[in-house]
From Swiss-Prot:
The keyword Manganese does not apply. The lineage of its organism: Bacteria, Pseudomonadati, Pseudomonadota, Betaproteobacteria, Burkholderiales. Catalyzes the attachment of threonine to tRNA(Thr) in a two-step reaction: L-threonine is first activated by ATP to form Thr-AMP and then transferred to the acceptor end of tRNA(Thr). Also edits incorrectly charged L-seryl-tRNA(Thr). It comes from Ralstonia nicotianae (strain ATCC BAA-1114 / GMI1000). It is an enzyme of class 6 (ligase). This is Threonine--tRNA ligase. InterPro entries: aa-tRNA-synt_IIb (IPR002314), aa-tRNA-synth_II (IPR006195), aa-tRNA-synth_II/BPL/LPL (IPR045864), Anticodon-bd (IPR004154), Anticodon-bd_dom_sf (IPR036621), Beta-grasp_dom_sf (IPR012675), TGS (IPR004095), TGS-like (IPR012676). It is found in: Cytoplasm.
Amino acid sequence: MIAITLPDGSRREFPGPVTVAEVAQSIGAGLAKAALAGRIDGQLVDTSFRIEQNVDLAIVTDKDTDGLDVIRHSTAHLLAYAVKELYPEAQVTIGPVIENGFYYDFAYKRPFTPEDLVAIEKRMAELAKKDEKVTREVWSRDDAVKLFEGMGEKYKAEIIASIPEDQEIGLYREGNFVDLCRGPHVPSTGKLKVFKLMKVAGAYWRGDSNNEMLQRIYGTAWAKKEDQEAYLHMLEEAEKRDHRKLGKLLDLFHLQEEAPGMVFWHPKGWQIWQAVEQYMRGRLAGAGYSEVRTPQVMDRGLWERSGHWENYKENMFVTESEKREYAIKPMNCPGHVQIFNHGLRSYRDLPLRLAEFGACHRNEPSGALHGLMRVRGFVQDDAHIFCTEGQIMAEAKDFNDLAFSIYEDFGFENVAVKLALRPDKRAGTDEIWDHAEEGLRTALRACGVEWEELPGEGAFYGPKVEYHIKDAIGRSWQCGTLQLDLVLPERLGAEYVAEDNSRKRPVMLHRAILGSFERFLGILLENHAGALPLWLAPEQVVIMSIADAHAEYAESVAQSLQKQGFRASADLRNEKITYKIREHSLQKVPYLVVVGDKERDGNQVAVRARGNVDLGSMPVSTFVERLQNDFANKS
């Protein structure tokens, strides 16, 4: 007998081997029809998978996150199937699932056009409607290479040839199409009902710019039509909110080819930056951090000792001077350890919290650069906490509380927490990693937050807690991190004198809340569609005179507001007041003030809040109270 334990704890027994699909059928016809895959002892498998021993089994449907991934993965294969049907000379390469969709890379003699995408999508729908069965076959590596070479698929043959000889090769077949894949896939193409091809872009074979340029077709796929429509609506809204467009419209910043991935901040954009930095500086000081500054360029030897040279060199800018090799820092942590090491530290000095608005540079691929969101030169709200093991829990809780409070001030109240675990390429022993990972789990439990675990996503020197904020249109952005590092203090010789006079290694907590300033400002701009709250707005108030006779009064109001700390200016141009209002409204200024005879003679101001909300006339003192209240409430 084979016993199958289901997620609710119930057991079903079968006299012999049974497939996932057969188990689903035994539970109910509805579940059997909805089944897309199975999860056996945590491992995803096809519905055709044959169970030959006692296992824990969950039936995966489109209601599961895994189910959506199976749909998207299968739709990527459907895309390749359709392309091969329409363009037999095209060669297939790879087609993974990505956030909200999938892509597939093709080698073809000419660029795919928008008209081609329409034709391909139509063919995909036809193939899905045929409801062809998707089957898995197991091949030897060499036979699989011969199969794809015989079909003229040199890229696929190259991928398979790089797999160890003793490893079995999984191929999936649907109709006339066969492809290499680990799976799982939907049981038949009829399960794929909601999809759309989005765009085509260039991509190098194996991500290497020395290789051939391929064509990458992006698509999205969903379980329900309404989910796809909501996603497409979100994309339309995101297009309107694109921070690159807002940066140009509002004259905040620009980028240019002479400095790829580096930002030219204009006065108004820099004003936003300074508002954020001053706010963060105050919050950090209040939380017991000391601000420091470390060098931009440091000798290769330090990066070798820290482990960055071995694990991170491909992302570092390297230079040479007087026969010495240097690296421009990609992160601040080794520099902060040098400050910790300068002088003898006692347990009484701990926890020591060192913060730096540190300018870093990383050699990101040019194709990955994207406005403020992905740059080569950036500033982090970086800090490192040196503490004892006994202090980890309290420090993690304090940081968690600080991070949530700061996100709330910036208007982000939906925050998800994730724990990224050890990657394949890492420093330190498994014992150290076990200790570090469990330390963060314990700290998160103490914070009372729920979290999701991400295997393989940690930094090379330690696991990390990630803070993902959700914006106004439902997108998730990873900003803050808390990383527990037992490796770097060891490698760089950090130590303190313990209470018993012995020398001990401190625990090092790497932490950031905003991440990079550039990216966070891009997120802020898109979240607010450029209409930043008063405390962040580069121009908070514009006072507009109706005629020349009101210019002196308008100027005096502006100067009064400036003396009280507000970013105010006077527009005294000889233009129609409606023109001025429209112009400054497009600049998304929070408050527009109009002054004429009535306002001048009564020491009042006529106020319009952003969005053309007429607040009427009021004394200047009343308006100042409103500004102060908005500022205090971060509204």
